[in-house]
Amino acid sequence: MAIQLTEQDGRQSMEAHAASKGAEMRDKYGPDIGWGQLLNILKDRTLVRYPCEVAFDAAGLLEGECAHAQPNGDQPDEGFTIFIHPFFAAQPPHAVRLALYQLVVVNYGPFASSDDAEALGSAALGISTEEYYDSLCQIADQLT
């Protein structure tokens, strides 16, 4: 008899996979993920599926948005740019947290959720999802 998987099963599987990728990042480049480690993570195709670069440029952001991953072309193989608000260029620890959150878009595309992003980022940093979420809220509050 075939097992019928639900949408919830799919979401849980995606979140677990994102968390495992975050844990791999921490194992390989941690335990402290700083700016240099982030740049190495972005080059590592076992962790980040497609080429990815970071640009401190608000042109790719919506009003009030801290960061956003945008495809460089029609095909994922053309890579992605993670736009981070220039305000955070002088705050590497914040920029790292913002970039990690965006990596689920690079790895999973539009299927990724905020829960997936929090799972990956918190696992990479070795903190709880609540602590990661709270830190992102504090970072975002700096733009207001």
Predicted regions, residues:
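Active-site recognition of the HExxH zinc-binding catalytic motif
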Residues: 93-109, 117
